[in-house]
Amino acid sequence: MAKKQEIRPKNFSDFVGQNKLKKLLKVMISSAQVQNRPLDHILFYGNPGTGKTSLASIISNSLNSRIKYAQGNLLDKKTDILTLFASVEENDIIFVDEIHAINKNIEELLYSILEDFVVDIVIGVESNSKIMRLNLKPFTFIGATTQINRISKPLRDRFGLIGQISNYQVEDIEKIIKNNSKKLNIQIDEKATNLIALYSQNIPRLAINLLKRTKDFCIYEECQIIDYKLVNKTLKQLGIYENGLNESQVKYLRSLSETFYKKAVSLDLIVGFLSLQKETIISEIEPLLISNNLIVKTPRGRKITQKGISYLERI
């Protein structure tokens, strides 16, 4: 079986965009190396697919440190925390993705771990119990979250840097597509590159996934280069519309325009009509529609905008 292609950037030069944050990280890394001490703990926040895990990996490469990955939603019990840090070596990096999903009942364990590199364990029960303190070797903790508002202040205060992953520009996404087309050994022309970028919601991961799916069609049709026509065909097959909307989002728009006659309508009515969970609509469907000004939230409910009406007429 062929080895899976690794397209994640390995260094800061490979990582497109986020120039201010990259500069700050390079300064921190250089300072830590000169002082021969671990890098301060870092918290990255931003939208999914924008490079938080990649930056953690690049930091690990820059420091020549071992990195251990974990998911916040899997850190549910005290033993999960203890297991995560039990084998930590000096200058290791512990990366926890979606750190906001850590069980809040065990979050306090992290405070002393991050601040003093110690963990207190209760041995025994009730009157016979005693606290045993374990000293950990100095390490760097990197957290990533898509929901910074769910990170408690005591936990946030343990990070030496809180870095926001800012929105990408179309030019950044186009460069990411070109860089990854080389890694994927596929040629792509300028118009095709621009079209993928415009349909990617300015999110690197989505752009790369669209490039991969277009490559699949290119191989299937035995073409030599990805062009505008092939990208357009791929997008239609995937059910992806202008600005990166999917079929569920377009159906939502059509319901506001046609079923509810362009009037403001309550979320409960929309939920009933689309047969979707309320949380799915709020977190998965509406954000892109709102950011593109295709719908607005009013005191009376959701309403399609004139831009949203024009969008439906255009697609």
From Swiss-Prot:
> Residue ranges of region Small ATPAse domain (RuvB-S)?
169-239
Task: Please state the Enzyme Commission number of this protein.
Answer: 3.6.4.-
Keyword Nucleus applies: no
Localization per Swiss-Prot or TrEMBL:
Cytoplasm
Give the keywords, sorted: ATP-binding, Cytoplasm, DNA damage, DNA recombination, DNA repair, DNA-binding, Hydrolase, Nucleotide-binding
BP GO annotations: DNA recombination; DNA repair
Q: Which SUPFAM superfamilies match?
A: P-loop containing nucleoside triphosphate hydrolases, Winged helix' DNA-binding domain
- Please report which protein family the annotation says this sequence is part of: Belongs to the RuvB family.
Question: Domain note for this entry?
Answer: Has 3 domains, the large (RuvB-L) and small ATPase (RuvB-S) domains and the C-terminal head (RuvB-H) domain. The head domain binds DNA, while the ATPase domains jointly bind ATP, ADP or are empty depending on the state of the subunit in the translocation cycle. During a single DNA translocation step the structure of each domain remains the same, but their relative positions change.
Q: What is this protein called?
A: Holliday junction branch migration complex subunit RuvB
